C-alpha cells in the first residue's frame, strides 16, 4: 500500500484482521518482523531498522482519545512540546480550535467534555506537533450515529484544508468510503484489495470484498461458453472461465422490479437489463433510511430462492 501526500487512506476489515496492529507498526509502537515501512522514501521500520516513535513525526488519535485527566485541554494539546514549538504553533492551534468551536474549552478538563468534544481535542493535539501523517484508530466508534456524522465531516474538512495525510482504521464501510481516497481491505493479516472506493465497490476481487460494502445476493451459475446461466437470467463473462460452476454476486440495489403486466421484451428493449425467466413474489418490505428493502421469493422447480432488493425512497 502507498499513501500519497494529502491523501486519506482507510484500513477496513473484520475484528482481529490486523488493522490496529498495522497502525502500531506505522507509529513505531510495535516493531516490524518482516517487510518495510517508508516515510518520504526513507525506511523507518524493517526487520533490522526501527526509528523510535518520537522521531517519526507521526500524530496518533486513539479510540479512547487518551487525554490526560489532570491536564486542561490546552495543556493536553501542547503536551510534550517545548516552548519554541509551542510558540511556533500557537496561532495555528488557536485558529483550528476556533474553526471547530472548542476554543472556549481551553481551561476545561477532559471529564467536563462530551465524547465528540474529546475527539475534537484529540485531533487538534495530533495536528499540533505538525506531523507528516496522522494515524486514526476508530476515532468515532464511541459516538452516536448523528454525532459521528458531524465529527467525521468536520475532521475530513480539517485534513483537506491543512493538506494532512491520514491513515484511518475502521470497521464501518460507509465511513471508509466517505473519508477515503483509497481503501485497503484486510483479512487475516493480508491486504486482499487496495484501491479507490469506487474500484472496491464496483470491481471487488472476491465475494468477501463485495459483501463488506453492502449486502449481496449469491446465485449459483452454470458456464456455457462465454455465458453464465442463472435463475435470474443469462450473464456474459468478462473473461474466460475454466470451470463449469460459478457463483454470481449481485447487490441488492442492482435488482430492479417490474409488474407482471409489462412484457419482458419491453423491459429489455427499454433498459438493456438481464431479465429472469421466472416470476418473483414480494414477501415483505422494510422502510430504511432513504430506501426500502424488499424480501422476494423466486420459485424455480422445487427450489425457493430468497432474494433481497433495495429501491430508493418508499
Locate the predicted segments by residue.
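Non-catalytic connector elements of ABC transporters
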Residues: 227-314
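The feature captures the beta-strand-to-loop junction immediately N-terminal to the Walker
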Residues: 12-14
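Helix-to-loop junction immediately C-terminal to a conserved catalytic motif
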Residues: 27
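ABC ATPase nucleotide-binding domain helices that frame the ATP-binding cleft
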Residues: 20-23, 121
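Short beta-strand immediately N-terminal to the Walker A/P-loop
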Residues: 9-10, 60
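Conserved coupling/switch loops of ABC nucleotide-binding domains, chiefly the family-specific signature
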Residues: 33-36, 188
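ABC ATPase NBD Q-loop/coupling interface
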Residues: 36-56
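ABC ATPase nucleotide-binding domains
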Residues: 53, 57-59, 63, 67-208
